[in-house]
């Protein structure tokens, strides 16, 4: 995955379901502009976004209830979203999936530990 040249010097909001959710909405309500918005998992179902980072396999949502309250939202997103949805494995049921280039990221950043989906998005 090459760096996204059009984003050099731009502002990106990475929005998950924790504190970033509140910070993002507060910023937007005060007129802050973001050049791109990256949604983490099911946040993509409730905000405008340019990209989704979902480092779970799509089968977690299609084939189980392991994601709890996120399951139905993610099924809907995965079936219809054109992408990119960065993930750890492709699934023919989800047309917008793009493999996250973990080997390239680890090599280029010389970083061998990413502990959550936000860390993957930042990398």
Name each model-derived stretch.
Residues 14-16:
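Short beta-strand segments
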Residues 5-12, 28-123:
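Acidic/Gly/His-enriched mid-domain segments of enzyme catalytic cores or analogous surface patches
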Residues 1-2:
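N-terminal pre-catalytic "stem/leader" segment of glycosyltransferase-like enzymes
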């Amino acid at each position: 995955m090459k760096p996204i040249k059009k984003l050099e010097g731009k502002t990106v909001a990475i929005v998950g379901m924790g504190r970033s959710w509140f910070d993002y909405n507060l910023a937007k309500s005060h007129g802050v502009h973001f050049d791109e918005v990256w949604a983490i998992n099911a946040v993509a179902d409730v905000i405008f976004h340019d990209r989704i980072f979902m480092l779970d396999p799509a089968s977690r949502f299609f084939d189980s209830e392991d994601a709890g309250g996120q399951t139905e939202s993610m099924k809907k997103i995965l079936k219809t979203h054109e992408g990119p949805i960065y993930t750890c494995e492709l699934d023919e049921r989800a047309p917008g999936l793009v493999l996250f280039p973990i080997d390239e990221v680890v090599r280029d950043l010389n970083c061998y530990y990413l502990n959550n989906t936000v860390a993957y998005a930042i990398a």
